[in-house]
Amino acid sequence: MDGGYGSVTIVHDARSPEDVFQDFCGRRSGIVKALTIEVEKFYKQCDPEKENLCLYGLPNGTWAVTLPADEVPPELPEPALGHNFARDGMQEKDWLSLIAVHSDSWLLSVAFYFGARFGFDKKARERLFMMTSSLPTVFEVVSGGVNTQSKTANGSSKNKSGSKPPKRPNSDSKPQKQVQAKYEEENGGRGNGGDEDQAETICGACGEAYANGEFWICCDICETWFHGKCVRITPAKAEHIKHYKCPGCSNKRTRE
């Protein structure tokens, strides 16, 4: 669907709200990565000495910090310009939150741009809106507005109590927090009559909800849950981690 950071190849045949939503999810995932688990890399690329830079989320789930498209007017709506200029003049948390808000606006504008170009009728537009609204906003993920840890999935065999992982584990439950996190042992999962809390468990990296059988891990600093694959932690690695610090917390403390 996309022909570059700020250009697009329009294909008119058989494009559905689901196609546009898939594009939306890919771009959103890339932006969430930039502002969370890859924030150190993103921070370095936002050099205030450079020209107006934009943060682009790409359909394949990656991101790029680059100059805006040369075309005037651009084929796609453009992200906010010049976020790099504000990097050193704001608290990092506020700076990232501001970018997140602008990114949410951009993601919706791109999605409904496609909807207009593909000739979506009222029902198709409403369907697209409902799908995009089903996910937490980038701002909610970045600012911690999404309750990613207190409502969790059923514990695994590693969970001594056999119930949900606690928000704050006991001091003697070292590996419990990591390894129990998100191994499905009983029925439940993502909606469909299962534990309602599970549908509200959101990964702090990709923003996706919990699904059956996934391994997740919780940061001991910010208490945010992550897919193990999103932060490159396996169950075997988690067994040997006394206190887990997510990439965002690790990078923040390094800069401080």
Curated annotation (Swiss-Prot):
Transmembrane segments: none annotated. The keyword Iron-sulfur does not apply. Disulfide bonds: none annotated. One of its GO terms (molecular function) is transcription cis-regulatory region binding. Its main location: nucleus. It comes from the Eukaryota. The record marks Y210, W216, D220, W225 as: Histone H3K4me3 binding. A zinc finger (PHD-type) spans 200-252. The keyword Metal-binding applies. InterPro entries: Alfin, Alfin_N, PHD_AL_plant, Zinc_finger_PHD-type_CS, Znf_FYVE_PHD, Znf_PHD, Znf_PHD-finger, Znf_RING/FYVE/PHD. It is found in: Nucleus. Residues 154-164 have a biased composition (Low complexity). One of its GO terms (biological process) is chromatin organization. Keywords: Chromatin regulator, Metal-binding, Nucleus, Transcription, Transcription regulation, Zinc, Zinc-finger. Residues 149-195 are annotated as: Disordered. GO terms for cellular component: nucleus. The PHD-type zinc finger mediates the binding to H3K4me3. Belongs to the Alfin family. Histone-binding component that specifically recognizes H3 tails trimethylated on 'Lys-4' (H3K4me3), which mark transcription start sites of virtually all active genes. Interacts with H3K4me3 and to a lesser extent with H3K4me2. This is PHD finger protein ALFIN-LIKE 4. The lineage of its organism: Eukaryota, Viridiplantae, Streptophyta, Embryophyta, Tracheophyta.
